[in-house]
Structure formats: structure tokens, C-alpha cells
Amino acid sequence: MRPWQTAVPAEDREIFDRGGFGQRQEWGRRPAVIVVDVCASFLGPRKPTAEAVNTVATSCGQVGWDTLPTIRRLLDTARAAGLPVIYTTPTPTTRTTKKPSNHGEEGLRIPDEVAPQPGELVIRKPKASGFLDTGLATYLRKQGVDSLITCGVSTSGCVRATAVDGFSHEFTVFVVEDCCFDRSQFFHNASLYDMNAKYATVVTLEETVAFLTTRAKEAA
């Protein structure tokens, strides 16, 4: 079993299993990739998370930097398959907090390793979900999208909110577990379990790459 599959107690897992939760969904015919909030303010310094948050309160630290290569591979594969790629970042804020949040323009910078390509949409969102007051659902429908392949940060926060709202807008949602990261490994795993049980299908990068590669070959 994968780590997130054992994130909840066995007695709770049994309840979900008996209820038939967590049924595997079929890949859609026209997926899009949603990259949630992979920007400087959520990465922070290349340090353990407990140290990184002392510099920037929203940091995930080294765990975020370590996830960038897997996100890059997902993006390379998706682009080669002709999928739309959409990014979200927070709306800039000058709000004062006890520790700096780095949500100004510099904090919203997407690292070069996973930067948008020309023509790819970057949405600035006012709240956790990529759908709230952004026009994302309308944009996706105009593109003919029927399913979402979701990655980014934080698994328990904006990724989850975007996945749940994607489900509520009647898209089939997939969350790529090894392309998501969080300040808390516990909340990362627990959120993956919860999303998989109710709102999305949690998949690995390898599963996703295999699907997209096959799809690209069939379309050629």
C-alpha cells in the first residue's frame, strides 16, 4: 500500500471500504493539467520545512524543491501529448502577518524548472480554490476539457480546494500524489486519502505518464 492509503486508522479504512468509497475513475478524453500555486512563497528556502517557515511562513522548504523534477516530467509529458496546462497563483497581498508571507510579486514567481510556456494560462486566485471568482470553469469548458490532472501545493490546502471544486463543477479529477507537496507529511497523506475516497482518483506520476504517452501514440 502507498503511504497515504494507511494514513487513517484501519477501523476508519474499513468503514470507507464497506461503503464503496474510493472507486477508480476512468481517464477522460480531453484532460488538462492544473498546476496549483507552485511559486516562490510556497517553496521558500532550500531547508527543512521547520526551518524554512522561520524565513517565510508559507514555505514548504526542501520538500517542495525536491518535488519540482516530478512536476517538470508531468508537464513535459502533458505538453508532448497536446494537453492544456493551466497555472494558479495567489492574488498579491500586502497583508501584514507575524511572519513574512512573501505573497508580493516576487513571492508569486514560478520557478524556471516548471515555468509556464508561451500561451499557457496563469490565473491569480483570491482564495484557496482555483475556481472561485476566476473564470477557470468557463475557460476549461471552452477548451473542451472533461477531466483535470492536478498537482502542486499544498496538498491539504489549495490542491484539495481546487480538486473539490473541480469535482463540484463536474470534471473528473485526478491528483498526482508525487507531484504534490505540503508542509505536513501527515496532512499530505490524510488529504490524499480523503480526496481519493470522495472527490478524485489519486494516481502516481508513472501511471499518469503511461496514460498520456499511450494517448499521444493513439492520436498520432
Question: What name fits each language-model region?
Answer:
Residues 71, 94-95:
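Glycine- and small hydrophobic-enriched segments that form the cores of compact globular domains
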Residues 83-90, 176:
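Short beta-strand segments at enzyme active-site cores
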Residues 55-69:
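A short acidic, glycine-rich active-site loop
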Residues 44-52:
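Short, flexible, mixed-charge acidic loops at enzyme active sites
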Residues 1-32, 76-81, 98-220:
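Active-site-adjacent betaalpha module
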Residues 35, 39, 91-92, 154, ...:
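Catalytic metal-binding/acid-base residues of hydrolase active sites
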Residues 65-84:
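A short, N-terminal amphipathic alpha-helix
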Residues 28-44:
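Acidic-leg catalytic submotif of subtilisin-like serine proteases
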